[in-house]
Amino acid sequence: MGIRGLMSFVEDYSNEFFVDLKLRNTKLIIDGYSLFHRLCFNSDLELRYGGDYDLFADVVQKFFESLFVCHICPYVVLDGGCDISDKKLTTLKDRAKEKIQAARSLSLGGGGNVCPLLIREVFIQVLIRLEVCFVQSFSEADRDIMTLANHWNCPVLSSDSDFCIFDLRSGFCSLNSFQWRNLNTIKDTQDYYIPARSFSLNAFCHYFNNMNKALLPLFAVLCGNDHVNLPIMDTFISKVRLPLSSKGRRYHRVLGLLNWLSHFDDPTEALDNVLKSLPKKSRENVKELLCCSMEEYQQSPVKLQDFFQYGSYVCTDASDLGLPEWVLGALAKGQLPPFISDALVLRRTFLHTQVENMQRPNAHRISQPIRQIIYGLLLNGPSHAEDIAQNTLPSQLLAFNEVERIDTNIKTSTVYAKQLLKDQCDLSKLAELPLARRQMLLLEALKVKQVVLESIPTFLKLPIAVTCYWLQSTEAKAKLHHLQALLLGMLREPLHAIVNSPGTEDPQRGGAKMLYEELCQVKAPMRPGPRVDLDTAHVFCQWQSCLQMGLYLNQLLSTPLPEPNLTWLYNGSLVHRLCQQLPASSSVESLLSLCPEAKQLYEHLFNATKSYAPAELFLPKTKSKSKKKRQKKKVASLGTTADAKHWYDRSNRFGPLMPESLEEHVENSELE
């Protein structure tokens, strides 16, 4: 992200380029992408098991509470889809490769930073709950952030080195030195502030021979940023013989370029000297590319202040594409993800790698049919209305590219959109379809009958529908304990609500509290823990992929089913730990009987999903001639399993959640 080596350089010499700041009583423009990555990777969160989203949400909430205490008014700006010019494609693919290696390292017990799949959606849900103002730019947000900060004359918070290039009136605060966990008070007052450090562009230019600020965009593209990666620039670097700094070789390129550029009065003179060192046949193309890339550091025409004040988002790049107004509005409000705009504009999407089994096909394969329906809805526009009505769209118009993991590398695969029935409404009117019609489209995509969800609470209808889809897929290798662990995890939100509901103490609340605390203890940190069970990890990565695409389709259809609270829905540490314990224990009925409401809800969830599960999910691992032999075998296995002792020390309250009645259901279904 940003200019190679620049952020490390300015922070290594922070005493030269940064000034101390006591941040309070101000607006603050926050680079949302930088923030949620920083909070995810620097808060000691478990990253191996697909996301402890509740703990991440707690960190996000505490961050913004620190701002509120200091009377700092945050405005979060999120990146949107890829730029229509696709000039960052090489950079994006390089990052995707790096994430694959990091995910592989985590899966084998090593280190690495990989954001859990739904971290961005969780971040947005927390912003909404805390009523933090936010906007999603149509593409990369840096210029929009700079323009808004200068309009409001307030600082920017980010970790992107591009903000060292922008001429920001009130400076740029680096997340690395933003001490939001260490609030201080103004002397002799009770007024809080956040100790921070602000990058001084004036000090930076003064350090390099009082160089002209206007030269910095040229420095950025010569040094190598996300937009420019020309091998021919290495020819220029070698020919100009950049001076070797006394600071050493680590920052040779950064220091050499800055010192070299500082001898020129303006960008035109410097650019001419750059081009002179290149072969004549390359000069015009290189000049055009460099000038175009330097434009990325100029003011944005988008006025985010109008969005925050009046709800109006106008982006000429987006408008010129002829996208429906409701789609543009939903993208700006974060009600549609960048995945949708990438598919709409570029006909290409990135499928982000998770900590999964790298020896198996990537976990997103399971949700491809859902994506094909999403692509079909996006194709369903006025320009193709007649062809769609006759089901005569040529195959090239149905083609979308997906950048996905293949083994430990990336590959672009072609996927064809699902041609929808001729009575489907076009994209511009999709949001106007009756609720029942939109709900039917969603459930048909997930291959679930509406009647199955009738007994399910509204906040769990979408996750249960997704779980039914997941169980039906031949890609999934789910076992009974995987399903049980997921459903148990879904009990945490209603349990938490019971425990924290106002009113006098009652036996029900006491039981709910005991069950909730039991689940909390199960998900206690396991570090330094065992290596990831790759088969279990892969199964849950597949489920999360189904959930992600189910969420996106639900959003595209204007949420015919309520969006679930992702904070409480899935906790990777909990479900992985449950999967370790469940096969080694014997019965859950006594545990769930502590809270009759939780037991009843669990039964509803299980009954809804079991009708879509393959019959082998419920078969015992080894056939036995009698129930007595089965019980003996179970006891014997418990005696040799260290983890089982944990459950039995708790009066045998936890187990595989498969009471005898479920075996009877299986037998009945086989008879039918």
Curated annotation (Swiss-Prot):
The keyword Lyase does not apply. Disruption phenotype: Aste1 deficiency leads to increased genomic instability, impaired DNA repair and defective immunoglobulin class switch recombination. Keywords: Hydrolase. It is an enzyme of class 3 (hydrolase). Residues 349-398 are annotated as: Interaction with SHLD2. Belongs to the asteroid family. Interacts with SHLD1, SHLD2, SHLD3, RIF1 and MAD2L2/REV7. This is Single-strand DNA endonuclease ASTE1. It comes from Mus musculus (Mouse).
